[in-house]
Amino acid sequence: MCIPSNRRSAIAIEAPVLIVADINTLWRSCPFQALSGLRPVLGLAPMDPLIAMRHRRLPWGAKRGTQQKMTVLSIVLPFGWATRRAAEVLPRLWTAALKECRSVGADPSALVVTSPHYAPLVRDLSSEFPICYYCSDDYMNYAEWNSNEMRQQESVVVQNAKHSFFVSEALRDRAVKEYAIDPARGSVSMNATGEEFLAPVSDLEIDRLLSRFRKLTRPIAGVIGGISDRLDFDLIEKVAESDAVGSVLLVGPVAAGFKDARLDTLRRNPKCIFAGEQAHDALRVWLQAVDVVLIPFRSCHFNTMCSPMRLFDHLAAGRPIVATDACPQVREFQDCVMIASTDEEFLEKVKEVLSAPADSTYLELMRKRAREHTWAARALTLNSRIDAELEKAACKADSLQ
């Protein structure tokens, strides 16, 4: 279903529409943008009035747009729509979604929810409508969210969903254990990369980019992605102190409200260059501009559970990758990612990479692995599983008639 912004489609669409609530983060949006190439998808983007104004739109009403072939319906809801007022307000979101589908002559086929906050909606709809869960994060360990409430709400979602997709084995295994579901009702769908990250970047583009940062000196070690307490800043400092490294380039936003004295130390280090937040699709140039890419995750619960998008973008860029062993999913790619279990080993691997040109066979293996893990590839699996669940639901409905 593809509708130009603020206009209704001139052609009625008869194919059933998959509704996704919500697509408010990149890692929730990307899989369903890709899926929209295979089936009609309506992505919901609810927000409160303050967020709406930050997006430079009116703090009320609904607005229609597109992301690739996915129709996006952003709708302003009252403050507390996802928390204290969820049971009251979320039915409005569902009503708006149904209205949007029917405005183009289509019926909804299923609902995919992407966070435990939608538990009230799942509870209301699950007996009469197919629902799936797409879990892209360890919501119980979000610092700003109530862990017990998240566990209770996620239990409702997982137990009522026809199928749940988890971005890591750790998240899937925990759900099977804690919510006592049949393992067949949960599968792993890791994060991925866009095919645009596989495209080579010209020397001219790289030179133009690096010219903005005159203090950069090769060899360049890059830390590309969000900057938060998931990173080992002491290890990054040691990399910067290494004689094998000319500069450490950090590209990405600092997490809101995050402060750390060790990060401040990095900012004062003349060998560390901070480029700030960049558009995600622009990161492919940054990635191909560096000589080695680092994934310096520290040992923590969140890294144990996660599926780092940066891993897949890094693979697509075809630059050598050195990572700590803090994330089990990163370790699954040890055939093309150099994994270190100690700081000393990490530094030695960085030095090893920078001391000699990367083997072409190794770089091609990285790109091969990246091609296996694109969002388009993920969409094929998601589509197949959703179709299977819809077919089972239809057969069950027929048997009851």
Region spans (language model):
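Nucleotide-activated donor-binding/catalytic signature segment of Leloir-type glycosyltransferases, i.e.
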Residues: 252, 260-285
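Acidic anion/phosphate-binding donor-loop and adjacent secondary structure
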Residues: 141-147, 176, 193-212, 217, ...
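Conserved donor-binding/catalytic core segment of Leloir-type glycosyltransferases
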Residues: 210-231, 236-237, 248-251, 371
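Membrane-proximal helix-turn-helix segments that form the acceptor-binding/catalytic region
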Residues: 98-102, 146-167
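Conserved acidic donor-binding segment of nucleotide-sugar-dependent glycosyltransferases
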Residues: 336-344, 351-358
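Nucleotide-sugar-dependent
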Residues: 281-286, 293-315, 323-332
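A charged, aromatic-enriched C-terminal amphipathic alpha-helix characteristic of glycosyltransferases
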Residues: 357-391
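Carbohydrate-associated surface elements
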Residues: 170, 189-192
